[in-house]
Amino acid sequence: MEKTNVQPATGKLGVLCVGLGAVATTFMTGVLMVRKGLAKPIGSMTQYDKIRVGRGAEKKYLHYKDIVPIADLNDIVFGAWDVYPANAYESAINAEVLKEKDINPVKDELEKIVPMKAAFDHNYAKRLDGNNVKDCATRWDMVEALRKDIRDFKEKNGCSRIVVLWAASTEIYVPVC
């Protein structure tokens, strides 16, 4: 069996969400609330649950972070792309998933999360009509613009690594062949 070389989770982790609507803002609000000690990470496998390691007399229960390198919640920096220019606080209020009383304790942090312009084609999400979109001549130009956004976000926020999460609307089926 080939050995893996898992690197430690050091430095800031940039979490970029494609879409800044109900799913993304609920996720962000939850992480920010846990960071402030205002909520427990119930439902978060990596933060709250334990996993059994070993059998019989050797078995013990460890947190995931004690087994694999996982970023500390305090090291996460959020960013997003969205077709609408509203910041994460405005989007969370508009989504009406969480109550305002639950969002307000992290209002300042959410207001700082302003979406970058989305790489968007109206043909794939006909019910969306936002104006916060990239003006690109080709798909390749969109790809290059997104790559630049990621590099710029990483540098601006001092992140050592970036993950991108899909939390956007998906409407249309496009056959591959």
Positions of the model-derived regions?
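Metallocofactor- and cofactor-centric catalytic cores in central/energy metabolism, strongly enriched
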Residues: 1-177
